[in-house]
Amino acid sequence: MKIGIIVQARLGSNRLPGKTLMPIDSHGNVLEYVINQIKHNKHIKKIIVATTNNSEDDKIIPVTKKLQVDHFRGNSDDVLDRYYQCAKLFSLGIIVRITADNPLTDPQILDGAIEKFFHESPNYLSNVIERTFPFGTEIEIFDFSTLHSVWKNAKLPSEREHVTTYIRNNQQKFKISHIKYKKNISNLRWT
């Protein structure tokens, strides 16, 4: 089964517009750091940046080319549809969801999450529902059939704007696994 990381990226943030391409230091911007971090994982080579069709996000495309990762453009408000169409186009059976504004995504945690996903075969695995990791280190993994079900059944605007809200609101419908840190440091904010 083909597995890929979809990195959700846009420049039109309300809290900090343009954050995705803001320079961190002389070595690169936030998106470059995110992608370079996740490239250190052991299991996945397919990385796709899923951005919007908005013209302001045209600036993201040269970064994807520079870093030699694929890109996909889709709906700016229906992020769930953007993910679904991206996963469908690239024939992904398993999707890892990362956001482009979290440069401290740890590839070792990503590796552990992927290994646990393959071992337990849940519909959805994350460090989001039962939080022990700092904010800004979110990793979510789900299979395409789960994404298809969510895409088909999510009706609320909040369930379309946020890719996995439907899963969190309907946990009884899914086999869910959690990754937890050895102690609870979820009070920290790394984003």
What is the predicted role of each segment?
Residues M1-P17:
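N-terminal nucleotide-binding beta1-loop-alpha1 segment
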Residues N29-I47, I60-P62, K66-L67:
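A short, N-terminal amphipathic alpha-helix
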Residues T20-D25:
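Short glycine-enriched, charge-decorated loop/helix-capping segments at active-site entrances
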Residues N53-F118:
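Short phosphate-binding loop-to-helix
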Residues D58, T105-W190:
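Conserved core of the sugar-phosphate nucleotidyltransferase
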Residues K2-V7, L31, K46-V49:
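Hydrophobic targeting segments
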